[in-house]
């Protein structure tokens, strides 16, 4: 009864107006699952390949009809007849069918759509919420949201090199409270920026995209917004950034155009360290470039005991690359993006490896998103503890937050909010003194 009987795919649009793929998998029982695949702007060079058509006369080359055809053709032929409850078998079938290291033949977007839609169909067949199907009876941890409230870099047309400035409501008692604290701070920040004559248009992920004098000014605005919202910077709301340093790394140097500075990896580490001393900055993603493994080692040695150092571009959700990072003492956390690796099984393997090595995990969206909220269920199902899914506006971001509210309601008293735990993991007490906070 849980046998796959049909697979369908279509081309839809993501939050940037670019095509992406949506897949539906139907079972013999009549149950079905649907999944839409996101797309990134700043991408790691070793990510699994997102298959695009390349026809400049259609969607400027970004169409995904080839991926759709692959799903409707040889992928459907290979998976029809498989049991949707056997996710590992299904994903291995996809991997064998593609036969390449980076999924370039069938496309990671095509494969992931089938993989996730199958999981949804299976959970529907069993009558289980998706988070419980993915994680079992112990799925109970509501993640701390890393809320992107100022955008820069590849996500916004402004002069900030750092791609994301985020807030983490670590002092909240529940996810519901965390969401409220973040929303209040977001609206306060908007008012502060507008009062000073800054534009309050938003970037790809819903954060504001002002032209500021410096990155330091961005931190000042955010800490002021936290305070004027009635919260304590650090104790109740901490800060996080995604530097996306690969985007401004050239010829072995870090070129910060907005700052008018060029840094070596040691100088870049020192610059980031200054912010952690000055502000309650407890999480840095992609502080150095993906190819700068030597620099990452130094960054981890100098800041890794007290700051969460999240590897995104350097690890690309790949268990083999993560294993190398663990062996070499690089980073202490990994960003998890489903479309970087291309199947649910490989994603779960990467999360398990990270947990075994005491690396924290952050489940993440992409800058080109859809209304699909699979990652919200994944974050709770795997007790990941953290989720990064944009700002407090744009329905493609809020879809994930609203799903987490529903999950928290469903869990009732069994749900645990991860805020205090992520702080204690890095020895952060919340009462530290900072120069400007």
UniProtKB/Swiss-Prot annotation:
Pfam families recorded: Enolase_C (PF00113), Enolase_N (PF03952)
Subcellular location: Cytoplasm; Secreted; Cell surface
Keyword Transferase: no
Keywords: Cytoplasm, Glycolysis, Lyase, Magnesium, Metal-binding, Secreted
GO function term, MF aspect, one: phosphopyruvate hydratase activity
Note accompanying the cofactor annotation: Binds a second Mg(2+) ion via substrate during catalysis.
Binding site for (2R)-2-phosphoglycerate: 163, 337, 366-367, 388
GO biological process: glycolytic process
Annotated metabolic or biological route of this protein: Carbohydrate degradation; glycolysis; pyruvate from D-glyceraldehyde 3-phosphate: step 4/5
Alphabetized InterPro entries for the sequence: Enolase, Enolase-like_C_sf, Enolase-like_N, Enolase_C, Enolase_CS, Enolase_N
Enzyme Commission code(s) on record: 4.2.1.11
Cofactor entry: Mg(2+)
Gene Ontology CC entries for this record: cell surface; extracellular region; phosphopyruvate hydratase complex
Keyword set includes Lyase: yes
Lineage top rank: taxon: Bacteria
Residues binding Mg(2+): 242, 285, 312
Reaction equations catalysed: (2R)-2-phosphoglycerate = phosphoenolpyruvate + H2O
PANTHER family cross-referenced by the UniProt entry: ENOLASE (PTHR11902:SF1)
UniProt family annotation: Belongs to the enolase family.
Name of the molecule in the record: Enolase
Gene (UniProt): eno
